[in-house]
């Protein structure tokens, strides 16, 4: 097995181990706090309804020195000046729309104003949604400090597969997806007195569904208040949707920002971004730099180039920091640290509105972001690099004017900004696969999807395709009603395909293996590929690669991780992301609890059986039979159904080219790639999803492929008896 070479062995290893131990202690502390929450909640719930507001929300008599230091900074925020006006309006109205530019303080202060106004009754909470996990965690941490409480006690957070709260929590920051999931077990959101939908301008899929659900709940719960907060002037649309709710405007940008455009479009926006950062560092005054890029690989490569250029040119030191959602929390928090040298933060659009970073004076904006797209006819959902909207460009520029006059360097022409960029990014609901959301709505009893109160109704084609997908997966019957399997599928915080894969795994005696694969697919990528060690990293990955494909490779990684005692050093040596696999381990435990709740047995297959890997692959195929590709020639495949010509993504460990394979992702970049691939036999697909493959609407080449396979299958099965493989 390939091992990572350490340049200065002993000192580096000791430092690395010390850092990893620190991470482990932090993660263990979070886990312990979360576990304690579960046991104390039940006892406390019995008495908290009898408490007064003063007993429920503690009135502290003594505060730390840091509390008073932070308080002075809070009073300088633009939103603080409107505290009394806001409290008056929210007391008099059930719904309030608040527009405040990024940096106005609305995300941290408005929930505290709600508490100060006495609007949270004993045993109830104010829930604040965020579109991104990193924002939910970082803002909860900040607010707990501002209120002089310990994170996870009075102020907590909840993201997918992770919650830090207690029986004393009266303020909770959570992702919009988590609030949507909570509504399935608490349809009237009874635990909340006030709900704040923050960053509503981002129009995520979950936020748009919450608009419709909460609008209906407000009619039944006159004691519930809703605050919709946006960083852009889409307020008129929100006001109209919520029956002319009052609008409060809060100024945000404290200082002017000078905008610079390029004379012509950059041929390579990454090279142009690096060059611009070096020019700023060489020729401009003090102040930190924020660069917007589209994804993890771009960001890591650009950080390395900036560091190398700075070093080779003999420039003053500059701390270059990456920021993206899958980055470990302890690394994300470094962007808030103060340091003597200039900071250059290279980020996805997570820094556009979700996080406020003090000290930014210069912004570099290439004008691109990764955006989700969905083709309902081909059922292909992809992340594409696409131009941003004018609203996003203005948000990015606004990051530079927080603490003093700033500059924004746009790596595109003024003409492109004025004539080519759209005004607002299209709502996610208009460009997403809706199968998961439709399943949740059906579970909530929303059967008339066509007349559901969407702010922007999705095209009928998208809803029809979502219903078709759920029907083929067995979640809906022929009348469109939720089946027993569909009801169980809705309980998993997963895509319907993964849920189906889990449910059928018990029948084939491999639920433990499928749990592992589902968990690994739900966590960040476990393989690390540093720019300077790519050959060694690729060699290390090959030692885990499975002959049959990437899903089984993930199983190998997890088993090796457990066999080696979850050792961070072992992960480091083998170019594995320790935190990602630990997260997968935590996800696995939660998914196992859901299986147990529905009395689905946790069993492992006999690894020595000739059917061991076949049963695992059949379970994967039971969820992903709609994502099949057939080999057409050497390295070229075509996808069944939409007949797209595709090739394997370079990251796959499947070196041979099987006739048929299933894939998890369709990736559109310079090529049409399929990623996370496993070899399957077509007769399995006919056995697992006969109704899907009997469709008359398939295009010609797909029909011919299916008919040919059916003839081969019927011919081979008539000449031999096929026993059950469920052993």
UniProtKB/Swiss-Prot annotation:
CDD domains, sorted: DEXHc_DHX15, SF2_C_RHA
Residues the entry annotates as binding ATP: 100-107
Region (Disordered): 1-41
Motif, DEAH box: chain positions: 198-201
A GO term from the CC aspect: spliceosomal complex
EC supergroup of this enzyme: hydrolase
Annotated signal sequence range: none
Biased composition (Low complexity): 31-41
Subcellular location: Nucleus
Keyword Metal-binding (UniProt): no
Keywords from the UniProt entry: ATP-binding, Helicase, Hydrolase, mRNA processing, mRNA splicing, Nucleotide-binding, Nucleus
GO molecular function, one term: ATP hydrolysis activity
Family under the similarity heading: Belongs to the DEAD box helicase family. DEAH subfamily. DDX15/PRP43 sub-subfamily.
Name of this protein: Putative ATP-dependent RNA helicase DHX15
Organism: Dictyostelium discoideum (Social amoeba)
The organism's taxonomic lineage, starting at the top: Eukaryota, Amoebozoa, Evosea, Eumycetozoa, Dictyostelia
Gene: dhx15
């Amino acid at each position: 097995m390939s091992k990572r070479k350490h340049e200065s062995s002993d000192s580096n290893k000791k430092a690395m181990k010390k850092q990893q131990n620190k991470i482990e202690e932090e993660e263990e502390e979070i886990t312990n706090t979360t576990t304690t929450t579960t046991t104390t909640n039940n006892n406390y719930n019995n008495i908290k309804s009898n408490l007064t507001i003063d007993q429920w929300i503690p009135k502290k008599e003594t505060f730390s020195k840091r509390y008073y230091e932070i308080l002075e900074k809070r009073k300088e925020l633009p939103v603080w000046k409107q505290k009394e006006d806001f409290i008056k309006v929210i007391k008099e109205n059930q719904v309030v729309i608040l527009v405040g530019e990024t940096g106005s303080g609305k995300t941290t202060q408005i929930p505290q104003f709600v508490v100060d106004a006495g609007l949270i009754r004993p045993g109830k909470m104010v829930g604040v949604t965020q579109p991104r996990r990193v924002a939910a965690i970082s803002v909860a941490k900040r607010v707990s400090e501002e209120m002089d409480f310990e994170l996870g006690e009075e102020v907590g957070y909840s993201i997918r597969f992770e919650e830090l709260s207690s029986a004393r929590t009266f303020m909770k920051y959570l992702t919009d997806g988590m609030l949507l999931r909570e509504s399935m077990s608490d349809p009237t959101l009874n635990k909340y007195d006030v709900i704040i939908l923050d960053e509503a301008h981002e129009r995520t899929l979950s936020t748009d569904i919450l608009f419709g659900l909460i609008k209906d709940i407000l009619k039944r719960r006159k004691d519930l208040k809703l605050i919709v907060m946006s960083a852009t002037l889409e307020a008129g649309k929100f006001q109209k949707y919520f029956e002319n709710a009052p609008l409060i405007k809060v100024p945000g940008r404290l200082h002017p920002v000078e905008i610079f455009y390029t004379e012509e479009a950059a041929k390579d926006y990454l090279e142009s971004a690096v060059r611009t950062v070096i020019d700023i560092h060489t020729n401009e005054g003090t102040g930190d730099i924020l660069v917007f890029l589209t994804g993890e690989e771009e960001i890591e490569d650009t950080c390395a180039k900036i560091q190398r250029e700075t070093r080779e040119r003999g420039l003053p030191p500059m701390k270059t920091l990456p920021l993206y959602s899958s980055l470990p929390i302890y690394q994300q928090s470094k962007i808030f640290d103060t340091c003597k040298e200039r900071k250059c933060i290279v980020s996805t659009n997570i820094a556009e509105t979700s996080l406020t970073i003090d000290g930014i004076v210069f912004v570099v904006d290439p004008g691109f972001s990764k955006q989700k797209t969905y083709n309902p006819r081909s059922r292909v959902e992809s992340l594409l690099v696409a131009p941003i909207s004018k609203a996003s460009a203005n948000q990015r520029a606004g990051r530079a004017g927080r603490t003093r006059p700033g500059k924004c360097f746009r790596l595109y022409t003024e003409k492109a900004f004025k004539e080519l960029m759209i005004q607002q990014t299209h709502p996610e609901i208009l460009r997403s696969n809706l199968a998961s959301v439709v399943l949740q709505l059906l579970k909530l009893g929303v059967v008339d999807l066509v007349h559901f109160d969407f702010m922007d109704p999705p095209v009928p084609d998208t809803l029809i395709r979502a219903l078709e997908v759920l029907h083929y997966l067995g979640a809906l019957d022929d009348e469109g009603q939720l089946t027993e399997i569909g009801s169980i599928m809705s309980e998993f915080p997963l895509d319907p395909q993964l849920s189906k894969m889990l449910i059928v795994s018990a029948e084939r005696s491999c639920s433990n293996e499928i749990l592992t694969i589902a968990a690994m697919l739900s966590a960040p990528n476990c393989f690390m590929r540093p720019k300077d060690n790519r050959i060694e990293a690729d060699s290390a990955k090959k030692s885990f690669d499975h002959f049959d494909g990437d899903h089984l490779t993930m199983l190998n990684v997890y088993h090796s991780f457990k066999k080696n005692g979850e050792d961070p050093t072992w992960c480091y040596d083998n170019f594995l992301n320790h935190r990602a696999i630990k997260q997968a381990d935590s996800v696995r435990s939660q998914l196992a609890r859901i299986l147990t709740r529905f009395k689905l047995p946790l069993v492992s297959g006999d690894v020595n059986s000739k059917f061991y890997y076949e049963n695992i692959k059949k379970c994967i195929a039971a969820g992903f039979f709609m994502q099949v590709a057939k080999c057409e020639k050497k390295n070229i495949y075509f996808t069944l159904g939409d007949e797209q010509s595709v090739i394997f993504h370079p990251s796959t460990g499947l070196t041979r080219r099987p006739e048929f394979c299933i894939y998890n992702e369709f990736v559109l970049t310079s090529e049409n790639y399929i990623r996370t691939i496993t070899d399957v036999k077509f007769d399995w697909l006919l056995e697992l999803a006969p109704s899907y493959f009997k469709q008359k609407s398939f295009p010609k080449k797909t029909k011919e492929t299916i008919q040919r396979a059916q003839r081969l299958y019927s011919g081979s099965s008539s000449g031999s008896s096929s026993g059950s493989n469920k052993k």
